Amino acid sequence: MTSLAGPGSTRRMALAGASVLLVALGLVVLMVVRPSEASPSGGASASQSAPAEGSVDAGFARDMAIHHQQAVEMSFIVRDRTDDEDVRRLAYDIINTQANQRGMMLGWLEMWGLPKSSAGPPMEWMGHTVEPSDDGSLMPGMATDAELEALEAAKGEQAEVLFLRLMTVHHRAGADMAQAAAGAAGTDAIRNLAAGMVRGQKSEMGLMADMLKARGAKP
């Protein structure tokens, strides 16, 4: 699989990956013991049968886990390249929210006894497939390797504007994916999580539009 991280980010991604793994393992335990507290809806409880490997639920969880991984990576990058408190606060919010959501989705896949990756192409669960391109962009909205390298190299306002533009595109595609899952998933857990993602990412898109405008830039 093409790397999602640019040069110099191996240590950061290792730390982020370890944190997400701990969250995922913890959520598996919580969902077995107290399912109503481990998800937005309690829909991952034993009262609902586990979705099939080729289901919308499993496909969305796998693809969005990858999508979220890059959002977390970009947020770590910009956090270290600006002193602007508003941008850093947004980056922290994205890191915390999307790392936790990613952990939930990986935890559900674990609980359902399903693999966390698929041999097929991304987006099959939406009724169409996307072949990963040579530029490193694995799914709609994801930044290319060159864009990640540019973000790594930028500093100050240049980094802020590039991050806000890349994350706006990332959120727009993520919200489209989540909207599809909210309407087609078979489990309450995925439907409710996806609906929450739509609301959260659309709200952040509005915030990022205002932040770009304040910097004299367009999305």
What kind of feature is each model-predicted range?
Residues 4-219:
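All-alpha RGS (Regulator of G-protein Signaling) helical domain and cognate RGS-like helical scaffolds
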